[in-house]
Amino acid sequence: MLKIQKCNVAHVKEALISPFGFKGGYLTQLWQSVAKVECDGYFAASPCTQSVLWSDPKVFSAFPGEKGDEIMLSVTQKACEMLEGMSFNTPDELIPALLPALKKHAFTLTGFEVAETFILNSLVGVDIAMWSVWCQKHGIKRFGDMVPQKAKNAMNACHQSLARIPLVSYGVSADEIKRLGETGTALMKIKIGAPSGKEPGSEEDMQIMVEKDIDRISAIHNLVKDISTPLTKNGKIMYYLDANGRYDTLTRLEQLLEGIEKMGASDRIALIEEPFSAEKEYYVGNYPYVFNADESAHSVEDVKKRIEMGYKAVALKPIAKTVSVSFDMITAAREKGCGVLCADLTVNPYLAEWNKQFASLSPALDVMNVGCIEINGDANYTRWNEMKSLLPAGYSVSEENKGAFQLNSQFFGGLSLLTGENGYYKYFGKE
C-alpha cells in the first residue's frame, strides 16, 4: 500500500500553430496542467492536456476563452486536495473514490452537470503520476507488467510497429494530404461535421455541413485513392471519419453515406466515429460500416451501451480518459469482440509516449495488418520540440518511418524511464 503525502498541480499554456478545428469550433491553445505526487518517498510528475471542447462542448460554449480551462484546472486542484492523506493498493482504486465529489465541485462551478469525460480529462496527469510511483515502488520496467490482471487477456498483442494515424482537420491543405499519402500513411483521421457559419444545429447548418463533408471526403479520396500501402488488409489507404457528434439524424447520416458510395469510397471507410451527440441514442448496427465510440464512452457501462446500439469499436484515450479507466474499457470492449484503437487529444510528447505504450499491447483493427495510434501534436504545437526536451533523460522516442513507428526492445523496456524524473518537475521549483 502507498500513502499520498503530497499532490500538487501547476499549469502552462501551449500555443497551436494555427486554429485547430473540430466539433464546429476552433482552438488556438491547449492548457497543460501538471500533477506532482509524493508517496512514501517516491515522486512523479505528469502533464495533462486539457481539452474542454472535446470533453464537454457545453462547458466550452458556456464559458468562453480561458474560463473553461480554469474550471477544469480547478477540478484537478480539488482532486489533489482530496488525494493528500489517502492510501491505495493500485492506482485504479482512486478515480472511483474521487468522481462523486469532483462532479459536485464541477456543478458548483458551472451550474450544471458536466460530462464525465470532463472530469476524467482533468485527472489524466494525476492518474499517470500515481501509476508512476506505483511502478517505482514495485520495480516495474515494462508496460505489460503494469497492466492489471483483469485487462491482460485484452492486451495480449506485442506490435513491432504502429501505423501512425495523422489528423486531417478542416484546414489541412491538398499538398499536405498528398504528402501524407506518399510518405506511408495507411489510415487517415478525417474531421467531418464541418462548421457552416450558420446557427449551430439549424436545418441550414446541418445541410451545409453534410454537403461540405461529402465534398471534403471526395477531395481527399481523389488525392490518395491510387496510393497503395502494405499496412492495411486491402492495400489501400483507409479513412477514419470523426464527426464529434455533429450529425442530428439518421437521415442526415444516410446522406453522407450515399455521398461516400457515389464517389466510390465505401471500401475505404475503416471507422465512423461519434456521428451523433451522446444523448441521441440511434441504433447504427444496420449499416455496413464500423461505428466507433469516443467521448460518449467513458466507462464500462457506456462501452456496453454503445455496443448494444450497434457500435463495433471504441476509441481508447488513456491520455484523455485516464489510463485506469482505459484498462476497464478495453477489457469490456474485447469481451464483446469490439475493435479498439488509441486515439489522440493533440497531447504533448510525454503523453504521446504513454499512448504508444498502451497501443503497443492493444489488438489491431480488423482492416489493419499492424497496430495503430493517432499522434498529431507535432503538426499542431508551436513548441513541440521544446516539449520533447521535457521527456525523461535517456528516454528514446520511436520515430515515424514510412507511416509507422518501429518499436524495439528499448521501447518495450522504457517504462522505468517514463515513470521516472522528467522535465515537468521544473514547474514546481524547489519543494
What positions do the PLM features span?
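Metal- or metallocofactor-binding catalytic centers and their adjacent structured scaffolds
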Residues: 38, 45-138
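Short, Gly/Pro- and small/polar-rich lid/capping loops
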Residues: 1-36
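A general structural motif
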Residues: 272-276, 293-300, 319-325
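Histidine/acidic-residue-rich catalytic or RNA/ligand-binding cores of hydrolases
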Residues: 55-56, 307, 325-329, 351-361
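Metal-dependent enolase-superfamily TIM-barrel catalytic cores that perform enediolate-based chemistry
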Residues: 148-279
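Conserved, mostly hydrophobic/aromatic
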Residues: 35, 41, 126, 139, ...
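Glycine-enriched alpha-helix->loop->beta-strand junction motifs that scaffold or abut catalytic
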Residues: 182-186, 261-268, 286-292, 305-315, ...
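Flexible C-terminal active-site loop/helix
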Residues: 346-431
